[in-house]
Design a protein with these regions (language model features):
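N-terminal glycine-rich phosphate-binding loop and ensuing alpha1 helix
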Residues: 2-81, 138-140
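Residues at the starts of beta-strands that form the adenosine-phosphate
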Residues: 4, 49-51, 123, 154-155, ...
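Well-ordered alpha-helical segments embedded in enzymatic catalytic cores
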Residues: 35-38, 110-114, 233
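Short, active-site-adjacent cap segments at secondary-structure transitions
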Residues: 59-61, 132-134, 252-254
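Conserved beta-loop-beta/alpha segment of the NTase-like Rossmann-fold superfamily
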Residues: 64, 72-75, 82-172, 209, ...
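Catalytic-core segments of class I nucleotidyltransferases/pyrophosphorylases
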Residues: 125, 138-142, 146-150, 177-254, ...
Length: 287
């Protein structure tokens, strides 16, 4: 059963400087909620209540966010502002949080490997918080993938079609279609050129991984820039067995860049806040 979810969150967030000079990019607020909280809510909806966050230097606010602030609680006690904390209280009440540090930035594969001691020998989810996924009707993206895992018991990556001139930003897959939205992966290339891309199906920041991925990452040689890519380990897993790609239902916003972040903010405001005249109302999307 899927209970654990890993959040790689040690990166510098340089595309959002100077804001991220003193604030983790995962704490950037979309309307009034930080990106990391949206991701944890999505994991919780999928049944993953054991949250492991891979942090780094200057990321202490991630830990503080999922903790009680007694001074603040006392200050707003008995006022209508108490309701503004209802979502985070619910998350804190249902999740356990563990933290481990990634001392060197060596790619997503290395970040996942850093969480091995906490994850252990269990299948687990991975959420990249700067990929904000919203599903207005029905289960969230990770919950959709968790249902598929019950059937296939293998690693699964979320994918979406991207323009051909953007494939160089992503890991790109190709394979055999099992259904309209499910592909058995046969090829996978990290950040290919337009010419070399096997398709326009790009991996986004949602994964379900089986625990044998750790040994495969450990055996993966660093590539460009000394980074260990998760796609290399997944391709090795494909050769040994099966890895699925899933074309998810819902909206995805790349909040790792300013345009995507603004689009996400407008979307969330219009769908969760604009219809309410009282902005202190609870607007958790994931229930």
């Amino acid at each position: 059963m899927l209970k654990k979810c890993l959040f790689p969150a040690a990166g510098y967030g340089t595309r959002f400087l100077p804001a991220t000079k003193s604030m983790p990019k995962e704490m950037m607020p979309v309307v009034n909620k930080p990106l990391i909280e949206y991701g944890v809510e999505e994991a919780l909806q999928a049944g993953m209540s054991d949250i492991c966050i891979v942090t780094g230097r200057g990321k202490r606010s991630l830990e503080d966010h999922f903790d009680v602030n007694y001074e603040l609680e006392h200050q707003i006690s008995g006022t209508n502002k108490e309701n503004l904390l209802s979502d985070i209280r619910n998350v804190m009440g249902q999740c356990t949080f563990s933290y481990t540090r990634q001392h060197e930035m060596k790619g997503l594969g290395h970040a996942v490997l850093t969480g091995q001691t906490i994850i252990g020998d269990q299948p687990f989810g991975v959420v990249l918080a700067d990929d904000l996924c919203i599903t207005l009707n029905g289960p969230g993206v990770l919950a959709q993938m968790a249902q598929l895992y019950k059937q296939f018991r293998c690693s699964i990556v979320a994918v979406q079609e991207v323009p051909a001139n953007e494939v160089h930003k992503y890991g790109v897959i190709a394979g055999q279609y099992i259904s309209d939205d499910l592909i058995r992966i046969e090829d996978m290339v990290e950040k290919p050129t337009k010419k070399d891309a096997p398709s326009n199906l790009a991996i986004i920041g949602r994964y379900i991984l089986t625990p044998d991925i750790f040994d495969l990452i450990h055996d993966t040689q660093p590539g460009k820039g000394g980074e260990i890519q998760i796609t290399d380990a997944l391709m090795a897993q494909t050769r040994r067995g099966c890895v699925m790609a899933y074309k998810f239902k819902g909206e995805r916003f790349d909040c790792g860049n300013i345009d995507g972040f603004i689009e996400a903010t407008n979307y969330c405001y219009n769908n969760f806040y604009a219809s309410s005249s009282e902005k202190t109302v609870n607007r958790s999307w994931y229930r």
